[in-house]
Amino acid sequence: RHIHVSQEDFRFLFGEDAQLHYTKELSQPGQYLCQERLTVKGPKGEYQNMALLGPFRKETQVELSLTDTRKIGLPGVIRQSGDTTGSPGCTLIGPKGELTIDHGVIVAKRHIHMTPADAVTLKVKDNDEVFVLTKSYGRALIYADVVVRVDWSYRLAMHVDTDEANAFSNQTEPYGVIVKFFDGNYNTDKWIEDVLSGINR
């Protein structure tokens, strides 16, 4: 769980002269963990000391797992990063004030970052949806609906939330195999219905 914050909201919560303080680099170039922390409050609970990621975004976005959203009483809306229209809001509590946002809380859709060169090698393209088969110890998983995100600024990495990561019991050698069906354009629910219809005939 983490927060991307706009500069305007950050200054309201931390003070007009406050700045983000770099702690460490993240998997994607230019993205970093910050020293600053916020409390995220929903109708039924709150999470304290939630990490902020830099740099500033145009719009504040809170990313939680489905378990997290249930704990604080918010609907879990699965979206790609940046797609926050119609998502639930929350209250952000900082050292200098409280701010209620009317949208911006999402459960991030699982995705893979890669460069255009990676995409050519892996035979995928931007916004394809693929399956990822993972190696594990008694709990191998097949992740479906994994969005491919392609840009020269990215570094090859798959991002899942804590719920998805905890279901996958391989912390020492986490890797997966990308499998692309239907030219990367499919609807899992429809596909499952078709399979079940065939079984039930």
Roles of regions detected by a PLM:
Residues 98, 136-139, 182-185:
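Short, charged beta-turn/beta-strand-edge "cap" motif at the junction between a beta-strand
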Residues 143-144, 189:
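Short, well-ordered secondary-structure micro-motifs
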Residues 167-175, 179-192:
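Mixed-charge, glycine-accented linear interaction segment located at domain edges/termini
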Residues 191-201:
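Helix-rich terminal scaffold detector
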Residues 1-43, 48-95, 100-133, 144-175:
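Short beta-strand-centered segments at strand-helix junctions
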